[in-house]
UniProtKB/Swiss-Prot annotation:
It holds the Pfam family Pribosyltran. Belongs to the purine/pyrimidine phosphoribosyltransferase family. PyrR subfamily. The gene is pyrR. It comes from the Bacteria. GO terms for molecular function: RNA binding; uracil phosphoribosyltransferase activity. InterPro entries: PRibTrfase_dom, PRTase-like, PyrR, PyrR_bifunctional. It catalyses: UMP + diphosphate = 5-phospho-alpha-D-ribose 1-diphosphate + uracil. SUPFAM superfamilies: PRTase-like. The keyword RNA-binding applies. It comes from Pediococcus pentosaceus (strain ATCC 25745 / CCUG 21536 / LMG 10740 / 183-1w). Regulates transcriptional attenuation of the pyrimidine nucleotide (pyr) operon by binding in a uridine-dependent manner to specific sites on pyr mRNA. This disrupts an antiterminator hairpin in the RNA and favors formation of a downstream transcription terminator, leading to a reduced expression of downstream genes. HAMAP family: PyrR. Keywords: Glycosyltransferase, RNA-binding, Transcription, Transcription regulation, Transcription termination, Transferase. This is Bifunctional protein PyrR.
């Protein structure tokens, strides 16, 4: 059974609020780079970049990050990591920049830890922040989001499903029991 938690308008409002918070906390956007975690985090990052351009009249670089090779729960740790999956990210100048990692849902924190490992393998930014559309709790690692669209406390057996129009043909967040 699924329950709608956020419709398209609620998602838009949440992303707009995150955008304003990014501007306020960073005192502008000139030294910011947005990095979306594949798959849905990339589309959320692009939307935030579009809104930042509207508000600040500045093109924000947006990168895509594939963390599959960095997940400790999905790969054999004896195998060497390949940076080919993130070669497009290596083209971005992250040195001394403020990187904002963007994902759809924050849950255990393992995805974010893997993303930080991937970024540090590429370059060393001045700062890494985290923006998520939904924070559902249940952290296994000491990671928290700096920018949150909506906190949705869930039971361990529940699941949050984020759908974005770019790949799912609609914007909606559902809670699945």
């Amino acid at each position: 059974m699924e329950k709608e938690i956020m419709d398209a308008m609620a998602m838009k409002r949440a992303l707009t609020r995150i955008t304003y918070e990014i501007i306020e906390r960073n005192k502008g956007v000139e030294d910011i780079v947005l990095i979306g975690i594949k798959t849905r985090g990339v589309f959320i990052a692009k939307r935030i970049a579009e809104r930042l351009k509207q508000l600040e009249n500045f093109d924000i670089p947006v990168g895509e990050l594939d963390i599959a090779e960095y997940r400790d729960d999905q790969r054999n740790s004896a195998e060497p990591r390949s940076t080919k999956a993130n070669s497009s990210l290596a083209k971005l100048d992250l040195k001394d920049r403020k990187v904002i990692l963007i994902d759809d849902v924050l849950y255990t924190g393992r995805t974010i830890r893997a993303a930080m490992d991937a970024i540090m393998d590429i370059n060393r930014p001045a700062q890494i922040s985290l923006a998520v559309l939904v924070d559902r709790g249940h952290r296994e690692l000491p990671i928290r989001a700096d920018f949150v669209g909506k906190n949705i406390p869930t039971a361990q057996n529940e699941k949050i499903n984020v759908f974005v129009r770019e790949i799912d043909d609609e914007d909606v967040v559902l809670l699945e029991n």
